[in-house]
């Protein structure tokens, strides 16, 4: 009696979780293993698809690209397709980074072909994304000459200097901080080295920099370019380490 009262008092001060036995319950889990009319690949596209505008699935493999065309002696590839299979899991070889590299190579080859076709009577194929801003009128297909005039007029209207933008901000009363000046000098030196070592992307004019990224969120473009630059920096550091070890 006294022992039972002691236990009851102890349970009031320090509550104890009690376990109750239940009868066994049978549970059945049903998956999608029955009555499946689609293939494994088609079901994978519904899970790993990442299309930006809800288009139907399409292949974006680099192996199944649109081929190349020889223009003014330069093999110009087809315009890269936007990837639709990003899994958003931080892959080492991200499809957006690969797309950025393909787009950079495509712009570089297209600009090289536009420079070599100048002064000739050869016409750029109208179905091969002609760079109207880089071509002379005699090299533009007849069907696209009106569009070429519109492109040139828009380019002429754009200011070539930053005077219009600078006028929006008040003039600085004092000099820039030393840290800012040092950072500017460092960025200029890095940009100069990048143009010398990897001039492919820098050869593209700023007016064509956004080509291929029009319908893609800007944060995706920034992510792809950032990852590409970090990877190139890592490769350069590894090459410098190899050179130093070889000299030792």
Swiss-Prot record:
Keywords: Mitochondrion, Transit peptide. It is found in: Mitochondrion. Disulfide bonds: none annotated. Pfam families: Oxidored-like. Residues 69-116 form the Oxidoreductase-like domain. Its main location: mitochondrion. InterPro entries: Oxidoreductase-like_N, OXLD1. It comes from the Eukaryota. Residues 1-26 form a transit peptide. One of its GO terms (cellular component) is mitochondrion. Belongs to the UPF0651 family. Present with 2100 molecules/cell in log phase SD medium. This is UPF0651 protein YPL107W, mitochondrial. The lineage of its organism: Eukaryota, Fungi, Dikarya, Ascomycota, Saccharomycotina.
């Amino acid at each position: 009696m006294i022992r039972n009262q002691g236990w009851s008092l102890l349970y009031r001060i320090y509550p104890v979780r009690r376990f109750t036995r239940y009868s066994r319950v049978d549970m059945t889990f049903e998956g999608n293993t029955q009555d499946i009319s689609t293939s494994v690949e088609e079901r994978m596209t519904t899970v790993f698809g990442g299309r930006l505008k809800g288009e139907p699935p399409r292949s974006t493999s680099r192996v199944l690209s649109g081929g190349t065309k020889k223009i003014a002696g330069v093999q110009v590839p087809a315009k890269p397709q936007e990837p639709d299979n990003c899994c958003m899991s931080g892959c080492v070889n991200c499809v957006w980074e690969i797309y950025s590299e393909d787009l950079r190579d495509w712009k570089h080859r297209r600009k090289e072909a536009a420079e070599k076709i100048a002064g000739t009577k050869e016409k750029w194929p109208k179905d091969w994304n002609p760079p109207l801003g880089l071509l002379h009128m005699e090299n533009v297909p007849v069907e696209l000459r009106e569009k070429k005039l519109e492109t040139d007029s828009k380019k002429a209207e754009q200011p070539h200097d930053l005077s219009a933008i600078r006028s929006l901000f008040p003039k600085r009363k004092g000099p820039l901080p030393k840290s800012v000046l040092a950072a500017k000098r460092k960025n200029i030196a890095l940009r100069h080295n990048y143009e010398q070592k990897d001039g492919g992307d820098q050869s593209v004019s700023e007016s064509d920099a956004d080509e291929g990224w029009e319908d893609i969120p800007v944060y995706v473009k920034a992510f792809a370019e950032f990852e590409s630059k970090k990877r190139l920096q890592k490769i350069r550091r590894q090459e410098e380490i190899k050179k130093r070890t070889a000299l030792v």
